[in-house]
UniProtKB/Swiss-Prot annotation:
Source organism (scientific name): Chaetosphaeridium globosum
Coiled-coil annotated spans: none
Complex formation: F-type ATPases have 2 components, F(1) - the catalytic core - and F(0) - the membrane proton channel. F(1) has five subunits: alpha(3), beta(3), gamma(1), delta(1), epsilon(1). F(0) has four main subunits: a(1), b(1), b'(1) and c(10-14). The alpha and beta chains form an alternating ring which encloses part of the gamma chain. F(1) is attached to F(0) by a central stalk formed by the gamma and epsilon chains, while a peripheral stalk is formed by the delta, b and b' chains.
Miscellaneous note of the record: In plastids the F-type ATPase is also known as CF(1)CF(0).
Family: Belongs to the ATPase C chain family.
Major site of localization recorded for this protein: plastid
HAMAP family per UniProt: ATP_synth_c_bact
Compartments (UniProt record): Plastid, Chloroplast thylakoid membrane
Site description Reversibly protonated during proton transport, residues in chain: E61
Function: F(1)F(0) ATP synthase produces ATP from ADP in the presence of a proton or sodium gradient. F-type ATPases consist of two structural domains, F(1) containing the extramembraneous catalytic core and F(0) containing the membrane proton channel, linked together by a central stalk and a peripheral stalk. During catalysis, ATP synthesis in the catalytic domain of F(1) is coupled via a rotary mechanism of the central stalk subunits to proton translocation. Key component of the F(0) channel; it plays a direct role in translocation across the membrane. A homomeric c-ring of between 10-14 subunits forms the central stalk rotor element with the F(1) delta and epsilon subunits.
GO cellular component: chloroplast thylakoid membrane; proton-transporting ATP synthase complex; proton-transporting two-sector ATPase complex, proton-transporting domain
Protein name: ATP synthase subunit c, chloroplastic
Pfam families in the record: ATP-synt_C (PF00137)
C-alpha cells in the first residue's frame, strides 16, 4: 500500500467524523434548548414535545453515524488501494 494513500485515508477519516458531527451537534443543542423552553411555557404538552424532540434527535444523530460509516470504510475497506 502506498504510504501517501494510507495517510490521506486516515486524515480523510478523521475529517469525515469531525465534520459530520459539527452540524448535528449544533442542531441537537438548539433543539434541546427550544424543547426545554417550550415545555417551560406549556407544561401540559410535555409528552408531545418530548416525543417530537426524541424523533428529531434520532434523525440528527443518523447524520453523525453516516460520517462514522464513511470513516470506517476509508480505514478498513479502503477503495483507493
Amino acid at each position: 500500500m502506498n504510504p501517501l494513500i494510507a495517510s490521506a485515508s486516515v486524515i480523510a477519516a478523521g475529517l469525515a467524523v469531525g465534520l459530520a458531527s459539527i452540524g448535528p451537534g449544533i442542531g441537537q443543542g438548539t433543539a434541546a434548548g427550544q424543547a426545554v423552553e417550550g415545555i417551560a411555557r406549556q407544561p401540559e404538552v410535555d409528552g408531545k414535545i418530548r416525543g417530537t424532540l426524541l424523533l428529531s434527535l434520532a434523525f440528527m444523530e443518523a447524520l453523525t453515524i453516516y460520517g462514522l460509516v464513511v470513516a470506517l470504510a476509508l480505514l478498513f475497506a479502503n477503495p483507493f488501494v
